């Protein structure tokens, strides 16, 4: 086969050595035939290959492969590569000859043909030629993919390539000059003085920090601003070095100069006088002024109050007895101020936040918010003779208890309200001491919510509640308290022999406010104080009803008694008589107190005591006798039923818990 080149009649002759046996044999370069070149009129063959146009063939064989080129680059005429279509082996041999031709210059070689990305810049890729897949060895798949791309652009000259390579080298050098950004470092020289404050200089020659920038950083650091350096007139940029020695030491650590002092730093400050950055305030020592203030300046001086406010919650969370009592007084004052602005409500809503865990009574609560109704620890002294009194609490095993202290605590949904009964001996400092003829008082206090209780027993009130609540306005101002009345739970022969009921009294600055006979206090719970002094609701008392009212009064602080003292008081003075006990199921009651005046209790009561040892199981049912024979004007609070009651409804709020507390 001969290839004729017009018009110069350049002829290529070669011998065919079984090229049509197997196509895959072309992968071996040793199989290729020898090429005989008769005439090479133009030795610079780079123009020949750079001027070839691409013809994308799907089957990988060059059919109708006319490779065009410009006339001025090769010969006077057109360079035409013809094919007689006799056999595909001739076409493959022709392409292989063109690829493997030796050139006098070192520019044309196999690598430059295959790797077109080296011949052309990355910004403008233009592959030189498209060749069949079987013409490339298997060890060069990347070169095959690069050579297989199609393009209609013409080739570029060597001058254009050289210029683009030079531009690419320049861009590469410029990229190398860019330094990697380092990680953010601490801007506080006090927390870590060894690490400098990273500031980008204006000229772009690295990162450094100047003295005036260092002083600005100190003024924006809450660790140094009030202590070592501070603003005197921030709007004018005037600041003072409170501790010049400490500031100079910090600057020395920043510059890695341990012997830095204020004199050396002062010389650097005087340098800024000439630059117009700083100025010395005349007549004042260690006072300087910034000529221009930055816009994004962090203000530290105004954050002193907020820092004190943020430090208050940790103090409140770990408050002692005194701080807890102060919090209670503050919440009481806030409640009393906001009380006359709303309307009264006879229902008590469940708290939104639960305080879980048993704590001493004096530090039961955290500070409540004004918009949430949270039962808090408050004890109210009710006395018919005095309005506002101060309490001096004294507990003695030999004294007769004239007050019964009840505590109620909501433990959230799914659990029962727990009452805590504690006898107190209260001495009035502004009035006569409590005598044995005084009526029994009920001093009530809320106990924080607890998840579990060790010992629990119940008491059933057996007062003959024949009267109903009177519609009367409570005149005593103060934090509103919910008054809950328990109905008569025992009927018929189970009524006490001395049915004289106690008197419920609310003490306040305007004088005591009493409720009519027949009212039994079940719980005093202080609300958020958003309601005014309410009017007590009236309604008939039924055997299965739970009536709630509200009274107001100034809350006092209660006192919890240890369990041993309480047991002695109950046994010696109140003539406590042990009765059969039962274990109370814990967390089995779910009271519903949201706006309901009636509460349906279980049909069978649970009665028990709290000894020091574990409760003994028993199937009997009875009541607890807590009679006080020395009290003449009031009946016994709780009486014993000699026989089991035919109908004794159980109220979840009558759960009573006795817990040992240390005074």
Curated annotation (Swiss-Prot):
Biased composition (Low complexity): 308-341, 503-518
Modified residues (Phosphoserine): 151, 188, 641, 648
One cellular-component annotation, GO: nucleus
Matches recorded under SMART domains: ETS
Effect of mutating residue 368 to L: No effect on transcriptional activity shown in IFNB1 promoter-driven luciferase assay
Basic and acidic residues bias: start-end ranges: 153-169
Location(s), subcellular: Nucleus, PML body
Residue spans of biased composition, Polar residues class: 582-601
InterPro entries: Ets_dom, ETS_fam, TF_Elf_N, WH-like_DNA-bd_sf, WH_DNA-bd_sf
Phenotypic consequence of residue 187 to N: No effect on transcriptional activity shown in IFNB1 promoter-driven luciferase assay
Composition skew (Basic residues), residue ranges: 170-183
Effect of residue 260 to A: Loss of transcriptional activity shown in IFNB1 promoter-driven luciferase assay
Site (Breakpoint for translocation to form ELF4-ERG oncogene): 25-26
DNA-binding segment(s): 209-291
Consequence recorded when altering residue 251 to S: In AIFBL2; elevated IL17A expression in patient colon biopsies; patient CD8+ T cells have reduced PRF1 expression when activated with IL-2 compared to CD8+ T cells from a healthy donor; severely decreased transcriptional activity shown in IFNB1 promoter-driven luciferase assay
Gene Ontology BP terms: cell differentiation; natural killer cell proliferation; negative regulation of inflammatory response; negative regulation of interleukin-1 beta production; negative regulation of interleukin-6 production; negative regulation of tumor necrosis factor production; NK T cell proliferation; positive regulation of DNA-templated transcription
Alphabetic keyword roster: Activator, Chromosomal rearrangement, Disease variant, DNA-binding, Nucleus, Phosphoprotein, Proto-oncogene, Transcription, Transcription regulation
Region (RUNX1-binding): 87-206
Function noted in UniProt: Transcriptional activator that binds to DNA sequences containing the consensus 5'-WGGA-3'. Transactivates promoters of the hematopoietic growth factor genes CSF2, IL3, IL8, and of the bovine lysozyme gene. Acts synergistically with RUNX1 to transactivate the IL3 promoter. Transactivates the PRF1 promoter in natural killer (NK) cells and CD8+ T cells. Plays a role in the development and function of NK and NK T-cells and in innate immunity. Controls the proliferation and homing of CD8+ T-cells via the Kruppel-like factors KLF4 and KLF2. Controls cell senescence in a p53-dependent manner.
Subunit: Interacts with RUNX1 (via the Runt domain); the interaction transactivates the IL3 promoter. Interacts (via its C-terminus) with PML; the interaction translocates ELF4 to PML nuclear bodies and enhances transactivation of LYZ.
Family: Belongs to the ETS family.
Protein name: ETS-related transcription factor Elf-4
Organism: Homo sapiens (Human)
């Amino acid at each position: 086969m001969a290839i004729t080149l017009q018009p110069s009649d350049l002829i290529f002759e070669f011998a065919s050595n079984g090229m049509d046996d197997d196509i895959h044999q072309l992968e071996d370069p040793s199989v290729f035939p020898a090429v005989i070149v008769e005439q090479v009129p133009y030795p610079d063959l780079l123009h020949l290959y750079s001027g070839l146009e691409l013809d994308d063939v799907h089957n990988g064989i060059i059919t109708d492969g006319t490779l065009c080129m410009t006339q001025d680059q090769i010969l006077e005429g057109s360079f035409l590569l013809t094919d007689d279509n006799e056999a595909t082996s001739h076409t493959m041999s022709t392409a292989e000859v063109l690829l493997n031709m030796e050139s006098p210059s070192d520019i044309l070689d196999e690598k430059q043909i295959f790797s077109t990305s080296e011949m052309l810049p990355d910004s403008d890729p233009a592959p030189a030629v498209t060749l069949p897949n079987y013409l490339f060895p298997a060890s060069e798949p990347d070169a095959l993919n690069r050579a297989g791309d199609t393009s209609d652009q013409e080739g570029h000259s060597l001058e254009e390539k050289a210029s683009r390579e030079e531009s690419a080298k320049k861009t590469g050098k410029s990229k190398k000059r860019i330094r990697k950004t380092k990680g953010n470092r601490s801007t506080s020289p006090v927390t870590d003085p060894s690490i400098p404050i990273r500031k980008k200089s204006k000229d772009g020659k690295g990162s450094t920090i100047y003295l005036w920038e260092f002083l600005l950083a100190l003024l924006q650091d809450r660790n140094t601003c009030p202590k070592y350096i501070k603003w005197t007139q921030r709007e004018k940029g005037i600041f003072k070095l409170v501790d010049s020695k400490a500031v100079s030491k910090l600057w020395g650590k920043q510059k890695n100069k341990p012997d830095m002092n204020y004199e050396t730093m002062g010389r650097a400050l005087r340098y800024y006088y000439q630059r117009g950055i700083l100025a010395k305030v005349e007549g004042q020592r260690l006072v300087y002024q910034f000529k221009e203030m930055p816009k994004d300046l962090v203000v530290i001086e105004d954050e002193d109050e907020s820092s004190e406010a943020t430090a208050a919650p940790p103090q409140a969370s770990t408050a002692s007895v005194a701080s807890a009592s102060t919090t209670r007084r503050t919440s009481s004052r806030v409640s009393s101020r906001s009380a006359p602005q709303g309307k009264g409500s006879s229902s008590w809503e469940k708290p939104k936040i639960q305080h879980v865990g048993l704590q001493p009574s004096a530090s039961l609560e955290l500070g409540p918010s004004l918009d949430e109704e949270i039962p808090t620890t408050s004890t109210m002294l009710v006395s018919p003779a005095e309005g506002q009194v101060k309490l001096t609490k004294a507990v003695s095993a030999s004294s007769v208890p004239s007050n019964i202290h009840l505590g109620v605590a909501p433990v959230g949904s799914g659990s029962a309200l727990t009452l805590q009964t504690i006898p107190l001996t209260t001495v009035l400092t502004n009035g006569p001491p409590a005598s044995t003829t005084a009526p029994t008082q009920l001093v009530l206090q809320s106990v924080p919510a607890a998840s579990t209780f060790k010992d629990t027993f119940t008491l059933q009130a057996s007062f003959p509640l024949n009267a109903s609540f009177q519609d009367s306005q409570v005149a005593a101002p103060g934090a509103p308290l919910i008054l809950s009345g328990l109905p008569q739970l025992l009927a018929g022969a189970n009524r006490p022999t001395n049915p004289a009921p106690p008197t419920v009294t609310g003490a306040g600055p305007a004088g005591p406010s009493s409720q009519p006979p027949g009212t039994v206090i079940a719980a005093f719970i202080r609300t958020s104080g958003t309601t005014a002094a309410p009017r007590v609701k009236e309604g008939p008392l039924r055997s299965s009803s739970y009536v709630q009212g509200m009274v107001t009064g100034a809350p006092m602080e209660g006192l919890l008694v240890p369990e041993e003292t309480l047991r002695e008081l109950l046994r010696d003075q109140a003539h406590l008589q042990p009765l059969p006990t039962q274990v109370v199921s814990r967390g089995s009651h779910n009271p519903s107190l949201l706006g309901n005046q009636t509460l349906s209790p279980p049909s069978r009561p649970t009665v028990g005591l709290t000894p020091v040892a574990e409760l003994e199981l028993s199937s009997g049912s009875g009541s607890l006798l807590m009679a006080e024979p020395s009290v003449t004007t009031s009946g016994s609070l709780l009486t014993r039923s000699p026989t089991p009651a035919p109908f004794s409804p159980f109220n979840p709020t009558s759960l009573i818990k006795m817990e040992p507390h240390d005074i």
